[in-house]
From Swiss-Prot:
Listed name of the protein: Putative pre-mRNA-splicing factor ATP-dependent RNA helicase C20H4.09
Species the sequence originates in: Schizosaccharomyces pombe (strain 972 / ATCC 24843)
Annotated ranges, domain Helicase ATP-binding: 35-199
Localization, UniProt: Nucleus
GO molecular function, one term: ATP binding
Amino acids binding ATP: G48, H49, T50, G51, C52, G53, K54, T55
Record's function text: Pre-mRNA processing factor involved in disassembly of spliceosomes after the release of mature mRNA.
């Protein structure tokens, strides 16, 4: 196939007028069938491959049919922030309306909606929060739960909540949209007499699937070799590489950047781009940038690119065959991320990314036998995570007996019991399992982790609300230090050490944040000191939201300590992280109050300091050990009142 023809094919969709693009989408010919199904049934399940137009067109069909004219607006949930924002902007373009006007979006810490908004894209967590203030979702005439197959904790919660709302609102409609969900299970859950299922048929371009003849010893290095081989051998077309996590992505990008130095002049110049949840939405949006013919995008992504988003120009997919799965241990209160083989459903979704605009190829870095042994579907998050957020949410809705909630899949009892115990010891639940007043009620209204929320809500008693606001924001935003893997690693350590505090990691992070604000939030200052500018900017945004949160309960937010004594800050944090304490053992490890052996994370400023007593914010389990993070030095006598309560 001539290169000129391929280049033209790649740009066809981009250069086609919007109205023609919409007509070319497979879902367009199902418009009337969809509207009739929604009119006649409370619940409509729409099955269709990624890219058929479900996410962008269904809300527009409903808007044009009058579903947002009188009784409420149209809501569309997404599991991921990137999708909610990017799709909203795309639909605004198609409607010839300014973003945030007729169509808007709402994601955590970022909202672009107005009184004129009739179509609202949002993360599933945002809709859950709205239920606190609008229990029957009376603002909405219809809600579309998109990508329901991803089975996040929020999605599963929404399924149960929406089932209850449907029982009380005959005028309410629900659309469940997915590329690969089991429609029969959903129909049985909601009641088959209420459900209509329709499939969107649409022909993808042919995709050639290539398997390995024998297993690879290192799929990450194999992915890099495959990318370089594609660039030197195959015609133009962008490349999408599926990996399991951030470290693998960063490793591959560095290797590709290094390879560009020795690349042949006959090849296109590769433009390596990351795509994972650790990036800001603006950073994620870079994958949609269009480059001229001398350049070839290679996107290294987690499963975020499996569904929901369609990146024009992808012709080649490299599938590692692995994904990260979080496993929660209710006995140790720790979680670990492990590499697991993907499901067959995910493998099919990944290969489909190559056939969007022209013929494609998928390079599966595993054998046909490995594929045959894969599970059909991935496990739901509700089976493998801490249940504290779920319990808080349901208690906030006034549910006395959690087991009466209509779970699509019931969480393990041991996970629920662990969450109930933790929330009781934190003072969020009373002995009857009800929210305490005011603390429990306030925490149930917070988007923060319950431990951080308690520290924040009690900070005025310690006179350090100003500092705890900043700390809560940093802990929520993520890692403030940028740790390069290059020759500048030592320079970064020297820069970071100027912020180190004897009290530990959290006061160190507070030093960074306050210095960032004191240096006028300057990007160049962050680069000079090897700090994550985007994380610090996000922490500022989170802090603004937290100030508003405290204002709702008339809690003063300007209180700050008059001196450099950090003990009150640490005592306040201990009020929230009372279970997360440990004392030093002879072998250098630590023993928690629950008797578990843990080790300090190597990145901690207290690593190898042999601090007698510590407090930590989180624990991560490896194959053989438990590591604690965000560590602070505490005094043993601070624990007296808490130990008395536990006994």
């Amino acid at each position: 196939m001539p290169n000129e023809f391929i280049s033209q094919s790649l740009s066809t969709l981009t250069n086609t007028p919007l109205n023609i693009q919409k007509k070319l989408l497979p879902i367009t010919k199902y418009r009337n069938q969809l509207l009739y199904a929604v009119e006649q049934n409370q619940i409509t399940i729409v099955l269709g491959h990624t890219g058929c137009g479900k996410t962008t067109q269904i809300p527009q069909f409903l808007y044009e049919a009058g579903w947002a004219s009188q009784n409420g607006i149209i809501g569309c949930t997404q599991p991921r922030r990137l999708v909610a924002k990017s799709v909203s902007e795309r639909v605004s373009l198609e409607l010839n309306s300014p973003p945030g006007s007729l169509c808007g979006y709402s994601i955590q810490f970022d909202h672009n909606v107005s009184e004129k908004t009739k179509i609202k894209y949002m993360t599933d967590g945002i809709l859950l929060n709205e239920i606190f203030f609008d229990p029957l979702l009376e603002r909405y005439s219809i809600v579309i739960l998109d990508e329901v197959h991803e089975r996040t904790l929020s999605t599963d919660l929404l399924l149960g909540v929406l089932k209850r709302i449907l029982e009380k609102r005959n005028d309410f409609r629900l659309v469940l949209s997915s590329a690969s969900v089991d429609a029969n299970k959903l129909s049985q859950f909601f009641g088959q007499d209420k459900v209509c299922t329709m499939s969107i048929e649409g022909k993808l371009f042919p995709v050639e699937t290539l398997f390995l003849q024998k297993p690879t010893e290192n799929y990450v290095d194999s992915a890099i070799e495959t990318v370089i081989n594609i660039n030197s051998t195959y015609p133009p077309g962008d490349i999408l590489v599926f990996l399991s996590g951030r470290k693998e992505i960063e490793y591959c990008i560095k290797k590709i950047e290094d390879s560009l130095i020795h690349a042949s002049e006959d090849c296109q110049t590769l433009v390596p781009l990351p795509l994972h949840a650790g990036l800001t939405v603006d950073e994620q949006m870079r994958v949609f940038n269009i480059y001229d013919g001398d350049f070839r995008k290679v996107i290294f992504s987690t499963n975020i690119a499996e569904t929901s988003i369609t990146i024009d120009g992808i012709v080649y997919v490299v599938d590692s065959g692995f994904n990260k799965q979080r496993i929660y241990n209710p006995y140790t209160r720790t979680s670990k991320l492990i590499n697991v083989p993907i499901s067959k459903s995910s493998a099919i979704q990944r290969s489909g990314r190559a056939g969007r605009t022209m013929r494609g190829k998928v390079f599966r870095l595993y054998t046909e036998k490995a594929y045959s042994l894969m599970k059909e579907e991935f496990e739901a998050d509700i089976l493998n995570c801490d249940m504290s957020p779920l319990v808080l949410f349901l208690k906030g809705l006034g549910l006395k007996n959690i087991l009466q909630f209509p779970f699509f899949v019931r969480p393990p009892t041991v996970h629920l019991m662990a969450a109930l115990e933790d929330l009781y010891l934190l003072g969020v639940l009373d002995e009857s399992g009800n929210l305490t007043d005011p603390l429990g009620i306030q925490i149930s209204n917070s988007f923060l982790d319950a431990n951080i929320s308690k520290a924040l809500l009690t900070s005025n008693q310690f006179g350090c609300t100003h500092e705890i606001l900043s700390i809560a924001s940093i802990l929520t935003a993520g890692e403030v230090f940028y740790n390069p893997t290059s020759s500048s690693k030592n320079d970064a350590f020297v820069a970071h050490s100027s912020f180190f505090a004897n009290e530990g990691d959290i006061i160190t992070a507070l030093n960074v944040f306050e210095s960032f604000v004191g240096n006028k939030k300057d990007l160049q200052w962050c680069r000079k000191n090897y700090l994550n500018y985007q994380t610090l900017r996000q922490a500022l945004d989170i802090r603004t939201h937290l100030v508003r949160f405290l204002n709702k309960f008339s809690i003063p937010t300007a209180q700050r300590l008059p001196s450099s004594d950090c003990s009150k800050i640490l005592k306040c944090l201990l009020d929230g992280f009372v279970r997360n304490v440990a004392h030093l053992q002879n072998d250098g490890s630590y023993k928690t109050i629950g008797g578990k052996q843990v080790w300090l994370d190597s990145s901690s400023v207290l690593h190898e300091k042999k601090t007698p007593w510590i407090m930590y914010s989180s624990a991560v389990e490896s194959e053989t050990q438990i590591f604690v993070k965000n560590i602070s030095k505490i005094e043993s006598f601070w624990l007296d009142k808490y130990y008395k309560r536990e006994k």
